[in-house]
Amino acid sequence: MLDDYYTWTYPDIPENVAQELLQLNGSLVVVGVVGRSDCDLANKMLAFGMEPPDDHTPEDGQIQCYYKPGTFSLLLHFESTYDAEISGQMIDVCIEDVDTPFDIDSFFERIRCRFVRMMLLALHVCHIVVYVENGLTFDPTLLTVFQLAKFAREQHLMQFLPQMLRETPAARISERTRLCAPRILFLFENFPGDEPKTRESVSTCEFQMEDCIYELLGRYNIVTNSSSNSLVALPNNKQFVFFNAHEELRDDKLLKAIDCLNETMYKPDLKEEEEDLEILAMAPFDGFVKPFTMPVYEKEWENLQYQEDHTVWNFLQRHVQDALVGCFDAGSFKQHAQQGPFQLLNSQEWHDCMATMHKLLVENAKDPDHETSNEEYKLFLKNFDEDLNYEKKFWAHLCELGLKKGIAAYKNAAPANYGTATHRQLLADATLAFEEEGRGPQAQAALAKLAAICHNHWEDGRQQCELLSLRSHPCTLPKNMPHEKHNSGVIHISTCNCGRTQGRREDPFNLRQANYEFYELIAQMCNLCVKVKQYQFPIFEPSVSDYRAAAFEAAFPLLNTGKSGAPQDEDAGEDEAEEEEGQERELPTKKKLQNTASNCCSHPLSPTFGSDLNMSIAGFGASLKESQASSEQLSNSEQNTTSSGTSSADTENELVVELQEPAKKEAREDVGPTDAVSTSTTEYLPGLVHTVSNFGLLPLFPSWSLACVGPSSIYSHNTGLQEHFQSGFLSGANFLLPWDVQLRLVHALKQQYQQQHHGKKQQRWKKQGDRLSLKIFVGMEYECSRGHRFMMCAPDRVLRGGADIERDTCSKVVHNNMPLYYPCPCRSQRNFLAQLMRIHVVTPKAPVNIIVDPKVCVGRYTFTLGSIVPPRLSQSAYWIIRLPYVYQGDDVLIAPPDHLDPDYPLAGGYLLPGMFGVVETDPTLDLNEPGMMGASAAGNFTRI
């Protein structure tokens, strides 16, 4: 026995206490105390002046009993998960379980379900239930607890308790399954600190809280007019809310000691007596033991008396007396139950009922292997926690609605087949549709399920091939259906090799489609391409049926091991010529290989625009007449011999071209080209020819094009390129740039050959230092995917008309790096990139030939035409060099940039300067003969 009360842990009741309780006969009122606590012992009995033993350890579901002799009330303290100490123990257990992640929602549901179970037990074995709240306001979550308890009682307990209680010692309460509709009381351990602790203020707070609680319990049908349908009962015209305003339940030890000292030294007056003098002598300083308080007046005395009477015990005993005198339900319900008033049992009968209810509601629930023949009770044990987690069901229902809405939004908007980008957009739209309904802890799992369902729907015959084209566009054809070639649905506008005809081209998926097949197809529709003769680049000619692409390892250095040495420069001396003739006799095999390499051109080109090529410009009509002035201007650009008294400034800007000896030319006819190499007939070059690729490997098809589209008279510098000849040019950007090149011809020192040939024409070249002024027209053409074409007058400037053409304009494009990509000036919401696609060259009518050797640097590769000997352009003709549409190295595709950085315009690639050269016209070389264009001595031309 502690102080003036007994305490024990149920069911271990001491014998002497059991005897005292038996003496009460049928006057035992059972009071249950539930609620929240913050102390270490999970004690909610401090307001009643009771504490558990010092060795007490709080546990979930443990019941501590208290009985004060001389009273008629037995207090049951229910330790539950709402106690901070017990919930802390549960958190520690969850943290120690490292295999299971901590889920706050599941943890909260578990806490609430266990508390509802203890609340159900208290409501069935107690006459009065005191809910302890350590806050200052009513906890609205308690309404949820009451609703769940009422649901569990009506839907589960009432289905099996009446039948199961009939077979137990608790048969007396089998019909109603409880002692009565328990009266619910509310104890608030703390009082608002900003309110005065007077009788009026405390009573006002209690009355306001009672009105609030009564309204809430009535609104949610916790309290009804019928005792059988009510979970709890509220007293009529009697206080059921108590605020602990005067007692410090968990006070400070130091402050309590000071208060005790103050009470000991309290005196009703300030008079000093003899015994006071003895105390004053022991005081450490003057005034130490003076009275702390002033005399108490009558009103203050009333407040002190109210504080003594305003206790929880007195508050509880008033309701206990109602139970003892039989007016417990008086005024609480308008409709009384037919079973009669509540029951007061003796201690033995109550213990039998308590043992039965505790076993049915608490003990059996902890045993997962418990067997019972009652199906309703079996469902209660199995589904109790799941049935109480109504939020989980609610969130699951919302997520299910959102899932249906999201799936419908995805399927309704999904086309027949679509790619990853469309799938992601549809999934994002479906997610937004889901979020209109679905939310809660299960939303993430539902979203994952939505993504899986949408993904399966996409893969069920609706997935696109999505192989990226060479322009980084995915294929739109179905993935699971066979198709001969890929199609991205993107259409580009491109121009043929000669530049006259534009056509629609599909997005290419391989190098052959990009650089060869389209131009071969559109050439059949162009009435100019089918007539012009094009330079035939060397390509792979297999000797076996199982030929394959050459393999390139990433770690293998790009070294040109198969490239032959550079051609040796010819000297003017006769001795060196004799040595070359000797080498010719000694190397017959080499000569044979060289002739084989030079015969790769199946369509010979004429050095002059003869009758065969005149067919290609038939039908131009008025355009030829309009270009007559340009023709006269170009014809006047022949060699102009000047006196040896040329100014020094002109001499510095001149290019020196050394004329070869006739003996040398004759020797060259026999020797042929000096750079012939053997080529593989079993392996081909998978990409384009570049500077470090093996000369023994040739591509399967040419990616470049070189065509003579007509005589130089086709172009008129006054009108530019006309639409009927070159279509798709932007206004003002259709002019070629004039380029004046000064040459000085240096004759051979040997005069024997010249003395034997005394012709009028030969006499013109006898003068050493003859000078020529060449006028070449050059155009760097760019083309965007919409078919817009324009010329550039500088690496960073688009030609805007004839006013942009100055004397040195052409030098800016031939002597500088020209960007491979440049923003198209066409007006469009999207910024299209134009690509350098053609180089226009109008050659002069002069005793020299123009040599072209373009080199395009893209990434780590520098791509070339692939010819060992650079092509020699015929005189007084209009030539067009078409560059590759797509560039590919040995085994790496070089995709065009998505956008161009203005600060780095050459990042996507550039055309190297110095692609033009000039060489003396060889009258002994007939370019109409197959292979002779490649037989010219390429090593002797002068680079402009």
Curated annotation (Swiss-Prot):
Bilayer-crossing regions: none
Region annotation Disordered: where it falls in the sequence: 560-597, 628-653
Described purpose of this protein according to its UniProt entry: Involved in nonsense-mediated decay (NMD) of mRNAs containing premature stop codons. Probable component of kinase complex containing nonC and recruited to stalled ribosomes.
Keywords annotated in UniProt: Nonsense-mediated mRNA decay
Protein's UniProt name: Nonsense-mediated mRNA decay factor SMG8
Organism domain of life: Eukaryota
Protein family: Belongs to the SMG8 family.
Gene Ontology biological-process entries: nuclear-transcribed mRNA catabolic process, nonsense-mediated decay
Compositionally biased tracts (Acidic residues): 568-583
Keyword Nucleus in annotation: no
InterPro entries reported for this sequence: SMG8-like
